């Protein structure tokens, strides 16, 4: 699918901001580089490096068939002997790892200002300074490079020579696995557990899955580490339920770290690259691990959605809660609620302030609703929180038809954004405030226009750096009924 005009504008702003300083440096070095090229031409000719392919990981904001220049310098070219990551040349995850953190934030800020320029001009506001990890753009002093912030780590497995089990990251643009001794942005210890799983599989002769031949057993592993707790959960993805030496294998995995409380097996026998299958069972320990956000406790099941960067998640959720302005007796609808984290944090915050509200969460995934109901009970909110397994658009259309009361609406849709029907019904319900969290500002910008046309004004929009060292930015918008 070709990029839209808004997407191209966002990309162009990132490129210009990220490369502005590099142009000054390159102009000073042009003469010396030309001399060097002349000398090297007399020596042994070297083959040119093929053009690098675009990064296609989760942090990419759009997909396009057009040639795409990464908004940060190519990881393959940016590496130096002092790089904090030993595999930065091959890994496509942290393409800006070698850039100063302040410059990363400045590039993202420029992109968001470009993307939301029309909306901001229409509303007479400016995009707030981006909230980085431990720092806001514009703050004086140093901007330390974030490390160890990803509390979810994963690996694919592939067969090696003589029964070896290979694990690590896919090399950028390929399905070739690059070994990862450690990852500077993952929670400490997570990568050691993943590498240990491969060694235990080798020891017990459990073959890795070959995705081309569709043979073998061990496909993936996911490690999730608590932030406010020290609990760890491991999910093993296998091609079938039965494994040789299964009990020994599960116990060996559980013994890799004393903080592992859950080992789960997910069975995925389908062809293709999807990581998880439909069946999951607990093979060691508790059904869930536990973590905390903004004073709320959350049980996290093996396949539940839970933010990868909990430190920035707390910041993002607090911005949303502040924007809600909840009052006594309000009805808060949490659309696309997942396991209920945003709504429950807001309800707990209101309760702690002595403000009674009613929370209604809507999520189409039944597993997410089951987690949300369990988490409501865990936080003593069962009497004031209800969660419905339904499509958000279908539910809000019915609510609008029945003229139901909604005082505050919280939206956190998938990357595709919301639907026109949902937004039209949201405007018909006339909530006093709307908070819109987005993992894709391009689709959020599109949706905000419809909300403004439907009778709302944009109070503020704040970028949040959820994934440092990438070009990914999340945003929170706060709207009020005119």
Each model region followed by its residue ranges:
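Solvent-exposed residues in well-ordered beta-strands and their adjoining turns
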Residues: 156-158, 224, 237-239, 480-482
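Short edge beta-strands and adjacent turn/loop segments
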Residues: 215-228
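Rossmann-like S-adenosyl-L-methionine
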Residues: 3-29, 35-38, 42-43, 48-54, ...
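Short helix/loop segment immediately N-terminal to the Walker
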Residues: 207-215, 332
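Short beta-strand elements
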Residues: 148-171, 223-225, 281, 287-293, ...
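Nucleotide donor/acceptor-binding cores
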Residues: 151, 230-232, 329-330
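Short, aliphatic-rich beta-strand segments
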Residues: 223, 230-239, 297-301
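Extended interfacial segments that mediate partner engagement and assembly in macromolecular machines
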Residues: 78-82, 89-208, 228, 243
